[in-house]
Amino acid sequence: MAVISKKIPAPDKVEIKTALLSVFDKTGIVELAQALSERGVRLLSTGGTYKAIATAGLAVTDVSDITGFPEIMDGRVKTLHPTVHGGLLAIRDDSEHQEAMKKHGIEGIDLAVINLYPFEEVRAAGGDYPTTVENIDIGGPAMIRASAKNHAYVTILTDPNDYAEFKEQLSADAGKTAYAFRQRMAAKAYARTAAYDAAISNWFAEALSIDAPRHRVIGGVLKEEMRYGENPHQKAAFYVTGEKRPGVSTAVLLQGKQLSYNNINDTDAAYELVAEFLPEKAPACAIIKHANPCGVATGSSLVEAYRRALACDSVSAFGGIIALNQILDAETAEEIVKLFTEVIIAPDVTEEAKAIVVRKPNLRLLSAGGLPDPRVAGLTAKTVSGGLLVQSRDNGMVEDLELKVVTKRAPTSQELEDMKFAFKVGKHVKSNAVVYAKDGQTAGIGAGQMSRVDSARIAALKAEEAAKALGLAVPMTKGSAVASEAFLPFADGLLSMIAAGATAVIQPGGSMRDQEVIDAANEHGIAMVFTGMRHFRH
């Protein structure tokens, strides 16, 4: 395969003599233009940026004056011109390039300050199709890419947050920039255009209902670098995609240390789980360890919901993540701070609760600003060696399913409510998952076992331990409903559940041996319903 090859010298210091400024986000642009003007830099600009700089009383030249071609088509065409791109792309030390510049009257551009139409913001706000298309920038990305390619000679700035460092460079080096800085800004520029194009590509896929586009690019903006990843020897960073889904990505850290990689992963799992329970129906609390719930409950008040969730497995809850579906109040905060907790996340926090939590300065307190809607569609992704698995979010809700009673005995109304509660929780438990629940409270949770029978046994064991800790005479699973997130392949799993005291079972169904399981349920007077929906989680 033939490739383009050209060795380009890279001078360390390049003096800024001419700058092109064309931005949508005008944060700091006038101040930057002022700093450049004071150094005698010639300013070129376009449209609204030109007006902002000129209004500030600074000398600035409209790009159309150097191209000899006016802005046309509502500004769609203004910088797509050889005079502009030649000035950005010319190799200053190449005699042929210099001759071409001289012949065509092209002036070299040493600095490009460019940011883009707010496509991502318009998309996130739900703009209609024509408006969203109109906010696809064309000239901006072209200038950014041209400048970044020629970073040996051209400095490209795409982020107002970099203006201060750039001005420091000018002050330190007599109006010049260092190659290392230009190189770093070029890398950042290409990352920006890549993310921008990814957002456009993904929007088209959504708008046209293309489930598996030929190219799938998942972009994100760096929110924070982390001390390490899952383990201290792993490097990590947190990127946000821009999806306006309330949760750990959008939450405000009200107090406490920076969230760790594991904190973020666990907090996301906790908040997505607790959002399954509508706050207008009842307060709810979920306690998470290692992305699995160790206790979930509703209650007549938020503090009662927390106490009931904690009662399921108070040992595992130590050092856990607590998620609430209602505003954290003072009474609940007083209870929570009695136990070592890593993170609390809630839709909001009262001032009284903040004053209580502050007594635990290392406790991370997050205000999410709302609850995520479990029914809203979205994507999830997971890396594998050399690949990326992408799927739609599991937004199936048990309330939306037509439950099928498959046993002789139908569940009572209370059993049915407990079944739905357990199935909601089971959706968020690592497979194989078995969840016992009674009266809006998990009684025992078995997670992540290779055998469903083992998950059922572990859940029952957890319930026995909880009963002992609470001084109860019988396990919490006695008279409970139990959920399996996937079908029961054999009757042995059901028999383990019955032995634990469950009287009602909810599962997807679909096994070759469904009838065998149904017969066993009928033999023991158990009520069982099929949901027709599986909730594997890995």
From Swiss-Prot:
It holds the Pfam family MGS. InterPro entries: AICAR_Tfase_dup_dom_sf, Cytidine_deaminase-like, MGS-like_dom, MGS-like_dom_sf, PurH-like. Keywords: Hydrolase, Multifunctional enzyme, Purine biosynthesis, Transferase. GO terms for molecular function: IMP cyclohydrolase activity; phosphoribosylaminoimidazolecarboxamide formyltransferase activity. Its EC number is 2.1.2.3, 3.5.4.10. It comes from the Bacteria. The keyword Secreted does not apply. It catalyses: (6R)-10-formyltetrahydrofolate + 5-amino-1-(5-phospho-beta-D-ribosyl)imidazole-4-carboxamide = 5-formamido-1-(5-phospho-D-ribosyl)imidazole-4-carboxamide + (6S)-5,6,7,8-tetrahydrofolate; IMP + H2O = 5-formamido-1-(5-phospho-D-ribosyl)imidazole-4-carboxamide. Pathway: Purine metabolism; IMP biosynthesis via de novo pathway; 5-formamido-1-(5-phospho-D-ribosyl)imidazole-4-carboxamide from 5-amino-1-(5-phospho-D-ribosyl)imidazole-4-carboxamide (10-formyl THF route): step 1/1; Purine metabolism; IMP biosynthesis via de novo pathway; IMP from 5-formamido-1-(5-phospho-D-ribosyl)imidazole-4-carboxamide: step 1/1. PROSITE patterns: MGS. One of its GO terms (cellular component) is cytosol. HAMAP family: PurH. The IMP cyclohydrolase activity resides in the N-terminal region. Belongs to the PurH family. This is Bifunctional purine biosynthesis protein PurH. It comes from Rhizobium etli (strain CIAT 652).
